[in-house]
From Swiss-Prot:
Bilayer topology: Multi-pass membrane protein
Example GO molecular function: G protein-coupled receptor activity
BP term (GO), one: sensory perception of smell
GO cellular-component term (any): plasma membrane
Naturally occurring in which organism (per UniProt): Apis mellifera ligustica
Extracellular membrane side: 30-55
Localisation: Cell membrane
Residue ranges that the UniProt entry lists as topological domain Cytoplasmic: 1-8, 77-87
Designated name of the protein: Olfactory receptor-like protein HbT2
NAD found in the keyword field: no
Family: Belongs to the G-protein coupled receptor 1 family.
UniProt keywords, alphabetically: Cell membrane, G-protein coupled receptor, Membrane, Olfaction, Receptor, Sensory transduction, Transducer, Transmembrane, Transmembrane helix
Amino acid sequence: KLWRMTGTWLGGFCHSIIQIPVIIQLPFCGPNVIDHYFRDLQPLFKLACTDTFMEGVIVLAFSGLFSVFSFLILVSSYIVILVNLRN
């Protein structure tokens, strides 16, 4: 059970570590006010003084990869449960 918790924490850590270099390289200028408290990347992209299309694509691609990976782990665990119930 500890490996599941560790895997979840490591997955979240890796997801964040991948997004940090994307945000650090953005040039920010002008008003620096975000009107909510959520830790989202889209409001930061709006504050950037450059075109953030490619950064958005990178973040979307990695988020999609992690979502698909999590879904596959979930489906595989259900398959194991169903196989064990059948036997």
